[in-house]
Amino acid sequence: MNNTIKTDVLIAGCGCSGLYMAMNLPADKKILMITKSDCESSDSFLAQGGMCMLKCEEDYDSYFEDTMKAGHYENDKKSVEIMIRSSADVVKDLVDCGARFAREADGSLAYTREGAHSSNRIISVSYTHLTLPTNSRVQIS
């Protein structure tokens, strides 16, 4: 019996980061996503649709400190900087792909404060995993 699976790209993890990576790979690639248990056990699912976004430059230092503190200062500082600086572009990409984030009456993104964050920088959707598009070239196992 041959249990070999052939794929162009293997992604470990089926949370938002894994899905975002899959969405940004070339369309001709066959993608296999694997998870250690089930998709409903991912941190993205458990976060109930919330994700952080840098609202303005004045919030950067506080956002950076909150993230470092939440990671017990074991985080890679350059990775944290990249995550924070790219957050608005990631949100734009997700909106362009159909993610529906909560909005204020004027149409702007609605921000809340959760977890270790010292200010409102969490945007959310109900059940993020249901609003991020996938397609037939992505297999989740």
Give residue ranges: language-model regions.
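Hydrophobic alpha-helical segments, chiefly the membrane-spanning helices
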Residues: 138-141
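Glycine-rich active-site loop/strand segments that organize a redox cofactor
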Residues: 53-82
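Terminal amphipathic helices with adjacent charged low-complexity linkers/tails
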Residues: 104-127
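N-terminal Rossmann-like FAD-binding beta1-loop-alpha1 element of flavoenzymes
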Residues: 9-32
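A short, basic/flexible loop-to-alpha-helix module at the beginning of a structural domain
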Residues: 1-4
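A short alpha-helix-loop-beta-strand transition element characteristic
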Residues: 44-45, 74-81, 91-109
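Glycine-rich FAD pyrophosphate-binding loop
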Residues: 28-45
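Conserved small/polar residues in nucleotide/adenosyl-binding loops
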Residues: 128-134
